[in-house]
Curated annotation (Swiss-Prot):
InterPro entries: DhaK_1 (IPR012736), DhaK_dom (IPR004006), Dihydroxyacetone_Kinase (IPR050861). This is PTS-dependent dihydroxyacetone kinase 1, dihydroxyacetone-binding subunit DhaK. Pathway: Polyol metabolism; glycerol degradation. Dihydroxyacetone binding subunit of the dihydroxyacetone kinase, which is responsible for the phosphoenolpyruvate (PEP)-dependent phosphorylation of dihydroxyacetone via a phosphoryl group transfer from DhaL-ATP. It catalyses: dihydroxyacetone + phosphoenolpyruvate = dihydroxyacetone phosphate + pyruvate. The keyword Metal-binding does not apply. Dihydroxyacetone binds at residues 53-56, 104, 109. Residues 7-329 form the DhaK domain. It comes from Listeria innocua serovar 6a (strain ATCC BAA-680 / CLIP 11262). Unlike the carbohydrate-specific transporters of the PTS, the complex DhaKML has no transport activity. Its EC number is 2.7.1.121. Its main location: cytoplasm. Homodimer. The dihydroxyacetone kinase complex is composed of a homodimer of DhaM, a homodimer of DhaK and the subunit DhaL.
Length: 329
């Protein structure tokens, strides 16, 4: 295992310290916690909290700041943060109008965020929760009941963040979030696995000429293994599955996110994005916005995911285009 670390037991602690020291103009650490909170406070605004296991950087701390999240909670690598840590995030985000929790659909995350919401309720903080389940690869897995929450979560952060910044109520934000979640679909592929520092070996093995379709962001293997193929053919496989799930038709408008899994160069991501654009053009589907880059990773996994957000409301594009002050958007 080759990693730039000072040992495996302090990796998250030192990452959090490095992050807040590097971006002290945007975020700060809530003392005694692994909560990253935005510096600017807006009384009367609904707070937005997300988080989960570390190892997916820049998610989620990279999306804390004006226009997006109020706070993010960092668990151990690929491990949900504890309810008490999440509760600290809720308190940091609360500005008197309630707090919305944006949770990826993993059993530990959902359970711990719900427990934290109960703690907040006992402290008279109104909390609502939405659960992102955009991964169409599998219905149930080692980590989930139902579909997993993956890169589409970042689009949810951005749209909900814009609405919150504009003064939407807690109930309005929850309803909007549920609409966006229902319209966003993701599917990923791995060219090589990742290694959790404390484990010391890859989560699965792939031959030099193999790829894994349907991988998760915790190093979970996918639903099928195939030989390496040209980008255009790979794009077609992922696109066709997503198109079928989303029932995309000629004339529909979409947002595309090509997300690097951690070790795939931008050159390859843009080659893939070009192939996706050709497929959408041939299908008569109009692309309103495209995002390409590492938005939600899986440590040093090589590969990418394709996310397509079907626009049920054209205002969502405007929300995605609004400027923010965060580390990673």
């Amino acid at each position: 295992m080759k990693k730039i670390l000072n040992g495996t037991d302090q990796v998250v602690e030192q990452m959090v310290e490095g992050l807040v020291k590097s971006h002290a103009d945007v975020v700060h650490r809530v003392e005694g916690t692994r909560v990253i909170a935005r510096n600017d406070k807006r009384p009367g605004k609904v707070g937005l909290v997300s988080g989960g296991g570390s190892g997916h950087e820049p998610a989620h701390a990279g999306y804390v700041g004006r226009g997006m999240l109020s706070a993010a909670v960092c668990g151990d690598v690929f491990t949900s943060p504890t309810p008490d840590q999440i509760y600290e995030g809720i308190k940091a985000a609360d500005q008197g109008a309630g707090v919305l929790l944006i949770v990826k659909n993993y059993t530990g995350d959902v359970m711990n965020f719900e427990m934290a919401a109960d703690l907040a309720d006992a402290d008279d903080i109104k909390v609502e929760q939405i659960v992102v389940d955009d991964d169409i690869a599998v219905e149930d897995s080692t980590f989930t009941t139902g579909r997993r929450g993956v890169a589409g979560t970042v689009l949810v952060h951005k749209i909900i963040g814009a609405a919150a910044e504009a003064g939407a109520s807690l109930e309005e934000l929850k309803a909007l979030g549920e609409k966006v979640i229902a319209s966003v679909k993701t599917l990923g592929v791995a060219l090589s696995p990742c290694t959790v520092p404390e484990v010391g070996h890859p989560g699965f093995e792939l031959g030099d000429d193999e790829i894994e379709l349907g991988i998760g962001i915790h190093g979970e293997p996918g639903f099928t293994r195939e030989k390496i193929m040209p980008s255009a053919r790979l794009a077609k496989q992922l696109y066709e599955r997503i198109s079928s799930e989303s029932k995309l038709l000629a004339g529909d408008k979409v947002v595309v996110l090509v997300n690097g899994m951690g070790a795939t160069p931008l050159m390859e991501q843009y080659v893939f994005a070009n192939d996706v654009h050709e497929l959408l053009k041939n299908a008569g589907v109009q692309v309103e916005k495209t995002l390409v880059g590492d938005y939600m990773t899986s440590l040093e996994m090589a590969g990418l995911s394709l996310t397509i957000l079907k626009l049920e409301d054209e205002k969502w594009v405007d929300m995605l285009k609004l400027p923010v002050d965060t580390i990673a958007w």
